[in-house]
Amino acid sequence: MNIIKPLTCILAMSISGLATAAVTLHVPDDVTLFVANGQKAKLSGSLFASSKTIELPNGENQIVFQYEPYFSQGNDRIGVESNVIIAKFSANDTDLNFELPKYRDHRVAEQEIKQMQWQLVDEQGAAVTKSEDKLVKSGMQIGRDYAREAADYNQTGGIAAIGTAVSVATIKTEPVADVETKVKAGDNTAEEMLHFWYDKADEATKARFKAYINQ
């Protein structure tokens, strides 16, 4: 059996599903999002918008951010910085917003912001379960490479750490029903890809794939 046809089918269905399945994180202007899932965060939105957004995949995500509310004092604006926070959370097909503390003035903020309590809330106002930690760097804090620091943190296995990407060769696959197991040597790569995408697909996609190859 030519395995390329079902491979193309499941690949197309998987990509189609991924294209419409995402988490939208809204980032207010007093939050600096440094890193999302190991990469420098790329936000969408106009320059002067009160908040911007970033699209994240369904499932587990990790972010690195800092909260810096501003306060007016005479003609000056005073910013008070939180710790740099690394956090992981899981969500699917939803919009998320930061829920952050509000302080009466900069003096109160300076006293309390290092121990701030914050949440990510979904469209129904429910808090998303998260794990957080401080992303600490000793010495001078100028010119920090947050993506590198997040990668190093993940290697330590901290409470907000996420696993590194798994290679195709190490993924445990389940056999596809009714697919011939004997293939020519030249089809090995295609078979591995087929197993990979099948294992990544949701149950609905798997069902459509089985129906397709049984035609």
Swiss-Prot record:
It comes from the Bacteria. It holds the Pfam family DUF2057. The keyword Transcription does not apply. The keyword Transcription does not apply. Keywords: Signal. Residues 1-21 form the signal peptide. NCBIfam families: PRK04517.1. Belongs to the UPF0319 family. This is UPF0319 protein VVA1446. It comes from Vibrio vulnificus (strain YJ016). The lineage of its organism: Bacteria, Pseudomonadati, Pseudomonadota, Gammaproteobacteria, Vibrionales.
